Amino acid sequence: VNRPGRDSHVLIAALVLLVIALVMPRWKVGREVFDYIVIFDVTQSMDVEDYDAGGTPVSRLNHAREAMRWTLRQLPCGSRIGWGAFTEYRSLLLLTPVEVCENYNDLIASLDNIDGRMRWANASEVGKGVYWSVRVALSTESKPDVIFISDGHEAPPLEPGAPISMPEDVQPGQVRGLIVGAGSDAALPIPKTDDDDRRVGYWSARDVVQLVSPDGTRILSTEHLSALHEPHLKALAGRVGFGYLRLTTPESLAAAMRDARFARRAPAPTDFYWVPLGLALALLV
């Protein structure tokens, strides 16, 4: 019985397997992944602080970004995500979708810079922004799904019952997507910020366009205050064939973005280093 010789062969084999595990490249294997453009409303109503983080008030935009940071860690490798911003009446692509694992740090760094400094106007025509988000997705090579995060606050306000005309080039179901409603049911003052996104006060009733009665004698709205306009966002979602989600916790957003209806079958880099590693450990037991 040549036990020492056998043990040395086992150790050499285990060492070879460990080296293979260390240098083994990732193989592309078909799996369920996701492809998104996430568009953030960066208008001033999104600065309303009606979320709470451990007793500290948090703005709608900051809560949305924090939820997206958490969601990024939940998406499987091979998934792709890009960023966009909505202000005035347009949704603009900021970052074309990239793979989430290889580009995680860059995605986080760019996400942190999506804020009010990107505003070029104080108007907020959310309905038009939703339609533009469809155009953005259609103009992107992979035709990604859309996540549109907004409180639905229209400025200037819409006349009650007035429809938002749908452009001819946008049709229901052209792309898949989800409108995510940010904010609470309570109407709160809208912070006023400068070009560097520094707070300089709050908007007052005389600073903004208000709806008035047909005879011009009564103010019918409080457009200097903002709450989540959920019925409006749900109606917009229905017009373009999107789903709707109210933004509560990061977990709820991650679950919605991992929903099977948004999954795509695509080759994705997959680690198999655990195979030689497991064999090496088995030899050493």
Segments from the language model and where they lie:
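C-terminal signal-anchor/stop-transfer transmembrane helix together with its immediate cytosolic
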Residues: 1-32, 258-285
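…and closely analogous acidic/polar surface helices at protein-protein or active-site interfaces
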Residues: 33-34, 46-81, 99-103
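Second-shell loop/turn segments in exported
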Residues: 50-61, 93-97, 114-123, 219-224, ...
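Short beta-strand-loop
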Residues: 80-113, 136-137, 255-256
